[in-house]
């Protein structure tokens, strides 16, 4: 059963420590003897804490701590919780008081310390069994010492603060920790060698400190060291220690000896405690052991303690050694003072040695102590004896001895009194002197002996009764033995003397004072004392004692002197004193003999004597009973007597036979006896013996031979075995080792067998695989078929058993040859393509020149007139046809792609994947790669990229380019050819797209954009990057301004318009214009394609490939879009379009996967060819422009572009009719083609189908390739429409939605270009372009430099309307990359908010289409210099504006507006960063288209550029500086939450001006009031635009910049200006304002309040798109969108409001007419830009209105279809259709869509751009995914990956 998860039991510290004691559940751990219950530890801990804190005990009064069930979790938890509460309360009460200090930081009580150590040990020693895993009988034997033993040791040892403790072999360190916790020692050190204990010691250290802190107890410093204490590094620690503990019980002699060497260096007074003594307890110094450690230490035993150690339960003694070198010093001092008295010194030593035997004599302690004194003072004693008479001397001498013993003092006094005054006086002096000396030597004497000897009894010779027992224990030496023998037989006398001595001794000890007894007592005491003094002297006198016993007492006394002199020279004092009293001498001798009696000594002597006597040797005594010698016979025969048996008489009846037998026996015995008696018997026996001996010899010889043979064999076999083992590398010395080695060999052999078998299996397997592969390969080879032949017409299935080597080589060679031939073909194709590319580049240059010229006049006309007429016509026809076809084919594909893209990061085209660590080199490589792409090196790849996504295929399918080509041919044959090249037949493009998808290397940014859009990383580098990019952008702006000046009208248009102009010429330009448009498209395509790459791949690999100056111009123009491109494939599509018709179309598919939905916009350039492209152009151009300007990050450049665009717009107005005609023709062709292609795409995008159908169809199929071509609109649409268009295949329905989005995007991007919604959305769907890498910065520098050189020329080159993008293309790849980097750096929350606002304005793109066209100019005029902070809102807005709408709208718009619209729409859809990227591309295309149709295209392009530029503003800066941003962002956040549920309602109020915290978009779209003001301002702008149009030539640069600002501050920005005037507009305005003026209105009062730059003409399409531009002027239609927009604003303000609002309409609504920031207004000064933009917008609006009406009709129809498809899926969830607003379901639907977006933020309807926007938010992605499912792939749910996600 699984144990339930329970928490550990934690005890909090009563000391207020942060440390806690935790116990894991269950508390019972271990098993068997090691089982332990931690619950008991918890209870004990609580008890100890209660003891420490009496106040704690009250908490446990009701609890019986002794009866707690430790196995009950609930009980223990309650106990612990109660304890913790009590502890917390006490700690809290004591906090700040002196109470803690009183009870804390003190040493623990021994019992508490023991508990702590037990806790520590239990916690640290996880597996006690491991401690016992050691080698037996090694120095690493582990044993633990108990706590009690250490405590006992401490009782015997006094410690101080200066002491240092060291534990040698500390184990786990518990002794060290106990010492550290017990006393304030100086330091404690533990050294342990074994690994396991040392490892546990580390844990003990940590846990001990923790627990001591928990209890609040002190402990001294300590260290636990792992190492060998015998190494030199630890010698210092040992020698400096004053207290050493060593458990040396199992160390062994070697380690003990090394320890002795170290202990010899210890300081005096050091204590060593060990479990085995280092010297004997009774150690005595002799001249033979002076080097022993015992000479410098006292040894004593610590009483054994039971259970003191872990290895045995028996008591174990420990020994205390005290280092004292004075012992040795005193020994030598004695030798020195004794001089030549060797005998005395020797006697002293002997006496010292015997002292241990006398320690048992209790009363003799002082006698023994004074032996040395007697010896030392022997000379004095001798003098005393000589000077005094015998009695006096004896008495004095005796008294001297007695005086040393308190018991004898009285007796000594009596003797002194009896001996007289003289003797007394001398005796006193002598006694005093002797006493002093004895006192001085007392310690010395005792120290030389063991502590046991300290209490000395009488020496072995004492005769005292108490000494008799001890005497028997004396050592038996030869002298003692001989003396004993000599005194034998006189035992009686000896006994008498012993008795006398006993009596006298007893009398003296008892203190009796009898007269006679006094003398005897004194004499006996004296003799005894003297004998004790020198045992040698006593022994020497024993021979004399024997004579004394034989003679009388006097005679014996006389004999004692010579015997003493002869036998003992060492005792002259005794001899002298014995002179008068020989009797005492004899007693002494008797005492000596008696004392020599030892137990069994006599028996031993007797046996010795008997054993040596001869007769004893001969005489054998009976054996002792029971011994082996005792014989059995002795026992048996003792009682046996022998009796003769009587011979019985012969029986009478003996049988005869028996008698015969007995006779035979008898005769035989008798004969044998006789034989034995004969003389021959002996020789016979001897002979037999000899024979047997000989036989035995033979047998022995044989045995020896066999033994030798065996030995030889063994030796030989052993030798051979060793040789063999050496050969095998086995070196062993024992059989066990050999067996072990053999086992290893066997094991290895088995392993090898297993390995071999496994390898055989693998080889068999691989052979089978090889055969299968060979079979498979050969089946396809005709050679194999020939070899194997056929059976019944079938190739043999079996591979030939083996191919001959020759055959195999031939086959391989043939394969190689085939491969080489194929490679040659490919190389040939590449060379052909390169040639075509060079031709295209030349043609592009020519076109750029022509485009510059045409842009001034033709583009405007073409964009306007062609846009409306051709877009309308073509939209209906082509879109319808293509929508059916494309939707069916592409919807499924897009659905899959949308799903995949939404979940995946955009795949960076391999073209962009450059491995280089050096940023400079990487930048160069990127530029080179981009150039190669521009040059068409990746053209082949471009076509395949169409396969990458259905969207791209649609673009590839753009067969209309041929139509465009003819038109272009009119302008210039080369251009026409290029256009055709740019747009190969749909099928070819589809194939190319397939190829592109297959060629990740060439994957255009469009592809990567969708993925990258998913991960906008805009956060941290903004400020830094802002400054860097600002500088670079300023340079770019200057260059661009110069370039623009060189080609004023084309450049501005081209800077943003290249993309648009591409689209615009394609869609709206007349045949005459279509040539320039085609040129411009080519330029824009290359630019946008590059931009697309830039957008997609931060690497911006595509950017470098700008084909030529025209492309460069486009690139310069497009770079801003490329910057935005990262947000969408739109820019990429444009750039690709610019590169070349075919290759761009081919390449575009690669990149377009991201923008597949936006594919329709690519037709922007194709717009001239295709109505869809035309329709998208204005919005796309506006979007692209805004993007371009944004990407350029040079508002000046945008202003110039805007001015140029205004001029171009005028020209386009003139050429609009011609362009429109051509575009209509082209559109019709394209629509037919697209409808055919779009038919596949249409399945997915019915709304798009119609207008965008061709474009979309082309886009889906050729979108990737077209990304270079048509990406302006296509990219824009790809973002907004590649999803939305695909979704809304009916161009009008989708265009309406797309246009609302595109419009919003345009108004955001074009009109409101100031905000680059795509940028803001970058954080949701687009890669984080704010994350600028060193490589990107280096690339930007390179591109900047190139821009400086190329910018002027390209812009000058593309003055033609068709080249409207050419001047822009004057921007080099550097421009594109710089724009991208700038965008990256400029992304800010404000930009996101602006993007959101733009997206909301995108919702109004229907109305805004024409309005956007004008507005693009206005915005360019107004917002050229708009700060990038607005970029944030730009992307989100574009996203919400729903790329699909811009696509549809762009398509609807016609050539000029179509491209711009597509770009704008893309921008709207780019509301997410991804969408922004697409929008950028769209903007680029829009710019190109704007070149074609300068007014609409320029405004759109400028807007897109601006829109992108605002994105470029760092969010952080915006956020910090723009108050509106904060308000809006807050509102966005708030409305996000609310918006989810009632996003539409919330959005309405926000757009309506509800002041709830204005979140980024909410502030931007704050109120309808703002929208009204936008309307008012728009009207003003329209008036200004009219004035500007009249004076468009005058203010091109200035106006363009203001317009750019305006478009940068698009819907949201303009709306903000209104808001500034109104409630929340200031916030929006601030958002719209460039980062330089976060709070433009406040910061830059000079700038007039931003005015909605929607031009009055907008009203037509603004009304159509006005609801989309709800932020702008057309609020009524957008209210839903507005409502939606605010919701998006909160939810996707950062991401993309409009996009999120799912109301491009709402976005467009939010995209109010571009409000001119004070700076912009001031810059604009005059309203001519507005007027121009207004005029252009009016013209475009008219065209767009017409187209939009048609498109709306188609789109509405398609939307209805989509509503069926998507509406059911998205619309019900997100009102996807409403996003398009009037285009799809009407404003209400748009509002619903917006609401859904706000709610889920994923409702992109089916609009690709919208999807992109959706990418910003997870909810959006989810809803998008949901929508995709419901919408048959139309859903753009995943904004980030929406473009790719859109089924194609």
UniProtKB/Swiss-Prot annotation:
Q: In which tissues is it expressed?
A: Broadly expressed in most tissues. Expressed in a large subset of neurons and in a small subset of glial cells.
Q: What is its EC number?
A: 2.1.1.360
| MF GO annotations | histone H3K79 dimethyltransferase activity; histone H3K79 methyltransferase activity; histone H3K79 monomethyltransferase activity; histone H3K79 trimethyltransferase activity
Where composition is biased (Polar residues), the residues are 419-428, 1697-1706
Q: Which residues form the DOT1 domain?
A: 19-336
Q: Where in the cell is it found?
A: Nucleus
Q: Which residues carry this modification: Phosphoserine?
A: 491-492, 494, 1318, 1324-1325
**Keyword terms, alphabetized:** Chromatin regulator, Methyltransferase, Nucleus, Phosphoprotein, S-adenosyl-L-methionine, Transferase
Keyword Chloroplast set for record: no
Compositional bias per record (Low complexity), positions renumbered to this chain: 391-405, 429-439, 453-474, 1221-1235, 1289-1300, 1532-1545, 1585-1598, 1681-1696
Query: Phenotype when inactivated?
Result: Lethality is observed starting from first instar larval stage and animals do not survive beyond the third instar larval stage. Severe decrease in total H3K79 methylation levels and developmental delay in third-instar larvae. RNAi-mediated knockdown causes a severe decrease in H3K79 methylation levels and lethality. RNAi-mediated knockdown in neurons causes lethality while knockdown in glial cells does not cause any observable phenotype. RNAi-mediated knockdown in the developing eye causes a rough eye phenotype, which indicates a change in photoreceptor neuron composition in the eye.
Instruction: State the family it belongs to.
Output: Belongs to the class I-like SAM-binding methyltransferase superfamily. DOT1 family.
Additional detail: In contrast to other lysine histone methyltransferases, it does not contain a SET domain, suggesting the existence of another mechanism for methylation of lysine residues of histones. Was named 'grappa' because the eyes of mutant flies are of a color similar to that of the Italian spirit.
The role this protein plays is: Histone methyltransferase. Methylates 'Lys-79' of histone H3. Required for Polycomb Group (PcG) and trithorax Group (trxG) maintenance of expression. Also involved in telomeric silencing but do not in centric heterochromatin. Probably participates in pairing sensitivity.
Question: This protein is called what?
Answer: Histone-lysine N-methyltransferase, H3 lysine-79 specific
Q: Which gene encodes it?
A: gpp
